[in-house]
Every structure is written in C-alpha cells, then in structure tokens.
C-alpha cells in the first residue's frame, strides 16, 4: 500500500474506490495498491 497525495490508475485493471472519505486504488496487481493520505 502506497500512501500518496495524488492517486491515479497505473494499469487498466486498477479501480478507484472511495472509502471513509479516502480515495483508494485496488488492483489485481498488489503493487498498484494506493491510498490518498
């Protein structure tokens, strides 16, 4: 999980989701997991 100021999709399988007011990227590739912090 990378915590970044600006999250974006890295590949086509990445999905942007809003959880508890935070934007999260989930993907089949675990290296693409990101959270806005």
From Swiss-Prot:
GO terms for biological process: translation. Keywords: Chloroplast, Plastid, Ribonucleoprotein, Ribosomal protein. Its main location: plastid. It is found in: Plastid, Chloroplast. It comes from Oenothera argillicola (Appalachian evening primrose). GO terms for cellular component: chloroplast; ribonucleoprotein complex; ribosome. Belongs to the bacterial ribosomal protein bL36 family. This is Large ribosomal subunit protein bL36c. NCBIfam families: rpmJ_bact. PROSITE patterns: RIBOSOMAL_L36. The gene is rpl36. GO terms for molecular function: structural constituent of ribosome.
């Amino acid at each position: 999980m990378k915590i970044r100021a600006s999250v974006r999709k890295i590949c086509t399988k990445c999905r942007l989701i809003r959880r508890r007011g935070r934007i999260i990227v989930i993907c089949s590739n675990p290296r693409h997991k990101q959270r806005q912090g």
